[in-house]
Amino acid sequence: MLKVESNWAQACDTCRSAACTVYCRADSAYLCSSCDAQVHAANRLASRHERVRVCQSCERAPAAFFCKADAASLCTTCDSEIHSANPLARRHQRVPILPISEYSYSSTATNHSCETTVTDPENRLVLGQEEEDEDEAEAASWLLPNSGKNSGNNNGFSIGDEFLNLVDYSSSDKQFTDQSNQYQLDCNVPQRSYGEDGVVPLQIEVSKGMYQEQQNFQLSINCGSWGALRSSNGSLSHMVNVSSMDLGVVPESTTSDATVSNPRSPKAVTDQPPYPPAQMLSPRDREARVLRYREKKKMRKFEKTIRYASRKAYAEKRPRIKGRFAKKKDVDEEANQAFSTMITFDTGYGIVPSF
């Protein structure tokens, strides 16, 4: 018996002695090559069962994608683990794996079915209808999600949303290149290298006669509008060269060319109102203005307005010490100190009593 563990391959559900190689969705069973040939060659209904390869990495789940870079069939879990490891692995191109054909493992069943089809015309018609039904069912199974019939027995393998983000930018670049090449073939445009600066490649070839007609028409338009453009703009800076227009050459314009060809200002600038020129004063007017300024300066009043007359009178009466307002207590102390000083000064001299 095959030892079935987390690190061993999935054993065949029929013989239990060999490693499985395919997974049958209809039977929800893992089968080896021999058991798959025996089971699905029994009848036509069994041969129409959809089988897919087993993942070559874990060998325990049905394969969902085929990596072209690694040349390996991987299940959804292994695919996400391997291709999310680094940016280089994310660029691998993967495609969904299609079911195995019903004639892959059973040559006997194939020969038998061919003999039956050739010998019996009724069976030939039935076989043709069955093949058409099988093709339609196979296309529907890959375009649409599975129905509720096999939704419970898919062992974590679902078809639908996992195929939405398969083709990464490597394949999209290839598709874009193919589409551009096809578009150029449809338009009959030769692929040439345009190395010259300022040349725009045309996408539609113009015949020689059509080109000559366009050139003549453009010449007539230019000759008729010469005077109008000369009178309005005063130059030929807005005229486009005929050869450059027809051949796809972008005319190059520089500041020096525009200055030489158009000496006057543009129309948009001419329409704007001009700024008033700065007024120049004569020496006499300037002297008169200075005198008026000095007279006004002399007439200015800087008198201090008195809002409260009572406050002004009280401020004048308040005692001051060294020019600052002082309290009554401070004034009394100062007066006593001055009186004591005067007494000390008087006692310094002797008093002569008179008789």
Curated annotation (Swiss-Prot):
Binding site for Zn(2+) 1: C12, C15, C35, H40
Residues involved in Zn(2+) 2 binding: C55, C58, C78, H83
Compositionally biased residues, Polar residues: 252-264
Keywords: DNA-binding, Metal-binding, Nucleus, Repeat, Transcription, Transcription regulation, Zinc, Zinc-finger
One of the record's GO molecular function terms: zinc ion binding
Principal location: nucleus
Domain CCT, chain residue ranges per copy: 286-328
SMART domains to which the protein is assigned, alphabetical: BBOX
UniProt zinc finger (B box-type) residues: 12-54, 55-97
Subcellular location: Nucleus
Residue ranges, annotated region (Disordered): 252-281
Pfam families in UniProt: CCT, zf-B_box
Induction: Expressed with a circadian rhythm showing a peak at dawn.
GO CC term (a single one): nucleus
Family membership: Belongs to the CONSTANS family.
Biological function: Putative transcription factor that may be involved in the light input to the circadian clock but does not affect flowering time.
Protein name: Zinc finger protein CONSTANS-LIKE 1
Origin species: Arabidopsis thaliana (Mouse-ear cress)
Gene responsible for this protein: COL1
